[in-house]
């Protein structure tokens, strides 16, 4: 009996040992790396990555702190919606109905086309208005047409204008040049020009003027050639107050003397073809001051006059050059 029990116990031990050996072989086969198995050993460059590295435990508890995406998510703004107020039909009608006391304003034009010329037409239909310049040349005008307030340059040459009235240029504070060449102007009112603060150039050749009006102090260029101007028609000291006068052209008139005194700003004086026979010793120079010089006055024309310039040698000592004229 004991022998049979020993044999049965031995067989059980052998079965368990065989079973354990088979299980060990299976486990070794499963754990042994096969050829081409990329999961057993990964070669990346000079580094070998093993599956065992993936056994590292990663703590995900602090991911919320490490990656805070709150700034990238736009904040939703909630605003209150206001419902449109209901308007009654009577209020709508009241808004659309005009008051019977209201009158529609008619636009006024104070610009170029609002001024009427002597032909009964707007000035800028008879003349040509370009910017602030008005061109009325050869337009059969008999007087100065009403001009736009912004007029800076006026050209009304070769017309039939005979008189300049006191209000012809009223309010034209920006008027810088007036050219009335080739008209029939015989008189200019004393108030027509003197109140023009910006006037610099006054061009009046080929007219019938016997006298000069009062001139504004800002005049720089004065051309009154080919008129009927007489010495008696020029007021005493008419030019001395013109501190900016540089060019004075009085040729081809009826002057019998040189008008003076002349402003120190003068650069050019044309008096040819008049009736001048004599001059004062201080016409150009201050005889009381022998160091006096007038370097700017380089152009004096007295040719075409009966005066003998050699009779007045003391009259030229301050000039940079002698006048042009008769010396014998």
UniProtKB/Swiss-Prot annotation:
* UniProt-annotated location(s): Secreted, Extracellular space, Extracellular matrix
Please list the residues that carry the modification Sulfotyrosine.
Answer: 69
**Which BP terms from GO are recorded?**
angiogenesis; collagen fibril organization; negative regulation of angiogenesis
Keywords for the protein's UniProt record, in alphabetical order: Disulfide bond, Extracellular matrix, Glycoprotein, Leucine-rich repeat, Repeat, Secreted, Signal, Sulfation
Primary localization: secreted
Q: Cite the SUPFAM superfamilies for this sequence.
A: L domain-like
Which positions carry the signal peptide feature in this UniProt record? 1-19
Q: List the disulfide bonds.
A: 285-318
Does the keyword section mention 4Fe-4S? no
Any one cellular-component term (Gene Ontology) = extracellular region
User: Which regions does the record annotate with the repeat LRR?
Assistant: 150-171, 174-195, 198-219, 244-265, 266-286, 296-316
PTM comment, free text? O-glycosylated. Sulfated on tyrosine residues.
Describe the disruption phenotype: Increased organization of cartilage collagen fibers featuring more smaller diameter fibers that are closely packed. Dysregulation of small leucine-rich repeat proteoglycan superfamily members in cartilage, including an increase in Lum and Epyc, and a decrease in Fmod and Prelp. In a surgical osteoarthritis model, a reduction in cartilage degradation and inflammatory markers, decreased loss of cartilage integrity, and reduced synovial membrane thickness. Decrease in vitreous body vaso-obliteration upon hypoxia, and an increase in preretinal neovascularization upon restoration of normoxia.
Glyco sites are at: 46, 80, 101, 308
Instruction: Name the site position(s) for Cleavage.
Output: 20-21, 30-31, 111-112
InterPro entries listed in its UniProt record: Leu-rich_rpt, Leu-rich_rpt_typical-subtyp, LRR_dom_sf, Mimecan/Epiphycan/Opticin
Give the LRRNT domain ranges: 112-149
The free-text tissue note of the record is: Expressed in cartilage (at protein level). Expressed in the vitreous collagen, inner limiting membrane, lens capsule, trabecular meshwork, anterior surface of the iris, the area adjacent to the nonpigmented ciliary epithelium, and weakly expressed in the retina of the eye (at protein level). Expressed in the nonpigmented ciliary epithelium of the eye.
Question: What Gene3D superfamilies does the database record attribute to this sequence?
Answer: Ribonuclease Inhibitor
Protein family according to the UniProt entry: Belongs to the small leucine-rich proteoglycan (SLRP) family. SLRP class III subfamily.
Question: What role is this protein assigned?
Answer: Inhibits angiogenesis in the vitreous humor of the eye, and therefore represses neovascularization. Binds collagen fibrils. May be involved in collagen fiber organization via regulation of other members of the small leucine-rich repeat proteoglycan superfamily.
Q: How does it assemble?
A: Homodimer.
Protein name per UniProt: Opticin
Q: Which organism is it from?
A: Mus musculus
